[in-house]
Amino acid sequence: SAPDRNVVFMIRPGYQSPAGNSSGWANPKDDDYTAANMARVAGALGALKTAYKSEKLVLVGHSGGAATSALVLGKHPGVADAALLLGCPCDVPPWRDHRNAQRGRGGPWVNSLNPLQFISGIPAGTPVVAVTGSQDDNTLPEFARRWAEQAAAKGVKSRYENANGLNHSSVQQWPDIHQKVNELVKELFP
């Protein structure tokens, strides 16, 4: 039987809820995968685990939320136990180069951490599924695939999956999300 589950929706620091609530800091140029913001997210997740008396925590993040999830796993080990990363810009410098070329402007994100640089902090055996839509022209599949391959080489139970026909936004409606979350939970509670 499945353990009791609580689902909590979080907004990244500096972003606003529909009610206008916000916390943290977001750079006007979106360069906000900072160490301080990752510490805020990790602190909030720790507080939620305590409040709900949670044994395990599975993160599900899209785009910047996926990068944040990958960073929390590596920079704050033990806060979360598994993750589903959807459309992850998991290798920030080449992703920024790609986005800048698409837009014909911009520069590097000098304040942001790169999830690839924190893979070694993720405890071995942590289950992670990284998924990118095959039609995603924002966070190209290669960024999440590279992260998953390097994480697996370090002992993380990571794998990459392609969501055929989906783009950066529509991957949020990928029909297999529920199944993948259930698989991650089953890995944590065999």
Regions found by a protein language model. Name each.
Residues 1-27, 31:
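Active-site machinery of serine-nucleophile hydrolases
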Residues 8-10, 82-86, 129-131, 161:
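Hydrophobic/aromatic beta-strand patches that form the interior of the parallel beta-sheet core
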Residues 13-17, 64-67, 89-92, 134-138, ...:
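Solvent-exposed loop/turn segments at secondary-structure junctions
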Residues 25-51:
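Alpha/beta-hydrolase active-site loop
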Residues 91-154:
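The feature captures the conserved acid-bearing segment of alpha/beta-hydrolase catalytic domains
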Residues 31-39, 138-142, 175:
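Soluble non-cytosolic domains of exported or imported proteins
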Residues 145, 149-190:
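C-terminal catalytic histidine-bearing segment of alpha/beta-hydrolase fold enzymes
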Residues 54-101:
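Primarily recognizes the serine-hydrolase "nucleophile elbow" in alpha/beta-hydrolase
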